[in-house]
C-alpha cells in the first residue's frame, strides 16, 4: 500500500524493492536455507502493488518493476531460473483517488486503473482487487462488490485484451518512460540501501511518504492536480445511486454475536491442549524454535488469533510505527501568516489531539490533518494508528488539548 500512503511511482518502486532485499538478505544470512534452495525462496517473493489513475505512468511503473526485479535476482542473488525471476504481484487499484463527491465517477477511475495492470502482458498482475465505487463513503454492499467483480469478468471474458502478446512492446513513449522511472527508482533504492536498508531507515521513509502525500493534498487544494467533481466540474445533477445512504449498514448486534461465538468456542474446546500449544508458541518465540509450526499447532488445538497475538506481544512487545509527522516537510505556503497569528494568540497556540481508533492502518487522513494543524501554528499530539478508546482518553487527560480530532474509516463516523 505504498501508493496509498503517499508514495510517488519512483518511491513505490524503490521502497518495495528495498523491503524485498531486506527480507532476502536476512533469509540468506540466517544460514537456515541451503544455497541450492535459495532460488525457491526468491521465486516465492510476491508484491502487493497499487495502480493509480495516470494510465501510461502506471503501465511503465510495472514494466520498470519487472525489469528491476529480474536485475536484482541475477546480479545480487545469482538467480538464473527464468520462472523464479518473474516479478509476481497482486494489485489493488487506488482507493486513494476515489471521491466522496460525485462518487459515480469512481467507476471509470477503477476501470482505467484496472487496465493499467492488465494490458501489458510482460508486466501483468497475477491477481486484481478492485474497490467498490462507494468505498469513499463507507463499506460497500454485496451488490457493490459484485459490480467490481463484473468489471474484471467483462475484461477477461468479453474483450480480446488478454489474447495478444504485449501490445506496448516497441512503443517509444512506453520504453522511454519505463527507462526514466527505472533509473530514478534505482537511484532512490541505492540511497535507501546506503542508509542501511528499508528496515533501518523506516522513519526516514515514512517521513518522505507523509511529505509526498502532503504535496499531493496541496496540489489538489490549489487546483494544480485536477480531480473531477472535487476541484473542477463540480456542478452535478442529482445522483440516483443513493450517496451516503448507499453503503453497508452493519447491525450493532453483530458485535455481540461475535463475542458470543468466541465465548462458546472457548467453552467447548480442550483447554489443556490450548494451554500446551500456547506454552509451545511462547517457547518457540522466545528461543530458536519455529514460530510457524507452533502457530499451526495452536490453531489446530483451537486457539484464537487474539490469544496468538497476546503471546507475540508478550515476547516481542508491540511495535509502534513512526508517524512521520515531526520530520516531514510540509507545504505551509499561504499558511505562514496564519501560523504567525496562531502562535501569537494569548495563552499560546491551540493544542490539537489527533487520534486514530480502530484496527485499520489507513493513516493518511489523520496525518494530513496533523500536518495542516502543525503548519497552521498549532501544537499537535499524534501517536499514530490503532489506538484504543481508553488510550485516547488517557492521552486527552494528560495532554489537555483544546481540540480532539478522530480519524475513522468505513463510515463509522456517520453514527457519531
Which positions does each model-derived feature cover?
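Short, hydrophobic beta-strand segments
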Residues: 45-53, 175-176, 351-356, 401-407
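Flexible, glycine-rich loop/tail regions that form catalytic "lids" or insertion modules at the edges
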Residues: 141-142, 146-153, 157-334, 397, ...
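Helix-rich catalytic cores of soluble enzyme domains
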Residues: 1-116, 130-150
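Short N-terminal or domain-adjacent regulatory/targeting segments
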Residues: 21-28, 316-347
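Glycine-rich phosphate/diphosphate-binding loops that line cofactor/substrate pockets in enzymes
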Residues: 39-41, 283-289, 338-350, 394-400
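Cofactor-cradling patches in redox/metallo enzymes
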Residues: 366-416
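Short, ordered loop/turn segments at secondary-structure junctions
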Residues: 94, 133, 357-358, 385-386, ...
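Short acidic/histidine-rich active-site segments
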Residues: 121-135, 161-167
Amino acid at each position: 500500500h505504498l501508493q496509498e500512503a503517499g508514495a510517488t511511482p519512483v518511491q513505490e518502486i524503490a521502497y518495495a524493492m528495498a523491503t524485498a532485499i531486506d527480507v532476502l538478505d536476512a533469509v540468506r544470512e540466517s544460514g537456515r536455507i541451503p544455497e541450492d534452495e535459495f532460488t525457491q525462496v526468491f521465486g516465492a517473493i510476491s508484491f502487493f502493488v497499487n495502480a493509480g489513475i495516470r494510465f501510461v505512468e502506471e503501465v511503465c511503473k510495472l514494466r520498470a518493476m519487472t525489469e528491476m526485479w529480474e536485475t536484482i535476482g541475477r546480479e545480487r542473488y545469482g538467480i538464473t531460473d527464468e520462472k523464479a525471476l518473474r516479478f509476481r504481484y497482486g494489485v489493488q487499484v487506488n482507493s486513494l483517488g476515489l471521491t466522496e463527491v460525485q462518487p459515480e465517477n469512481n467507476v471509470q477511475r477503477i476501470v482505467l486503473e484496472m487496465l493499467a495492470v492488465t494490458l501489458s502482458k510482460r508486466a501483468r498482475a497475477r491477481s486484481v482487487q478492485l474497490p467498490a465505487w462507494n468505498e469513499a463513503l463507507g463499506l460497500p454492499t454485496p451488490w457493490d462488490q459484485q459490480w467490481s467483480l463484473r468489471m474484471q469478468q467483462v475484461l477477461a471474458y468479453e474483450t480480446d485484451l488478454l489474447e495478444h502478446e504485449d501490445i506496448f512492446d516497441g512503443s517509444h513513449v512506453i520504453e522511454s518512460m519505463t527507462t526514466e522511472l527505472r533509473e530514478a527508482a534505482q537511484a532512490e533504492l541505492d540511497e535507501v540501501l546506503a542508509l542501511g536498508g528499508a528496515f533501518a531507515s523506516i522513519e526516514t521513509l515514512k517521513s518522505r511518504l507523509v511529505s509526498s502525500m502532503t504535496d499531493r493534498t496541496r496540489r489538489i487544494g490549489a487546483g494544480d492536480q485536477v480531480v473531477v467533481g472535487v476541484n473542477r466540474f463540480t456542478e452535478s445533477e442529482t445522483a440516483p445511486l443513493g450517496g451516503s445512504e448507499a453503503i453497508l449498514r452493519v447491525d450493532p448486534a453483530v458485535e455481540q454475536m461475535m463475542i458470543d461465538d468466541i465465548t462458546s468456542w472457548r467453552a467447548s474446546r480442550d483447554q489443556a491442549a490450548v494451554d500446551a500449544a500456547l506454552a509451545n508458541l511462547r517457547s518457540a518465540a522466545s528461543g530458536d524454535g519455529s514460530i510457524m509450526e507452533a502457530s499451526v499447532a495452536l490453531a489446530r488445538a483451537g486457539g484464537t488469533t487474539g490469544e496468538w497475538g497476546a503471546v507475540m506481544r508478550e515476547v516481542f512487545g508491540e511495535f509502534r510505527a513512526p508517524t512521520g509527522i515531526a520530520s516531514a516537510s510540509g507545504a505551509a505556503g499561504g499558511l505562514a501568516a496564519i501560523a504567525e497569528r496562531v502562535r501569537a494568540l494569548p495563552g499560546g497556540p491551540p493544542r490539537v489531539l489527533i487520534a486514530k481508533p480502530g484496527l485499520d492502518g489507513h493513516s493518511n487522513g489523520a496525518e494530513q490533518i496533523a500536518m495542516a494543524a502543525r503548519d497552521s501554528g498549532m501544537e499537535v499530539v499524534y501517536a499514530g494508528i490503532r489506538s484504543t478508546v481508553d488510550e485516547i482518553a488517557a492521552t486527552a487527560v494528560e495532554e489537555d488539548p483544546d481540540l480532539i480530532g478522530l480519524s475513522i474509516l468505513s463510515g463509522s463516523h456517520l453514527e457519531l
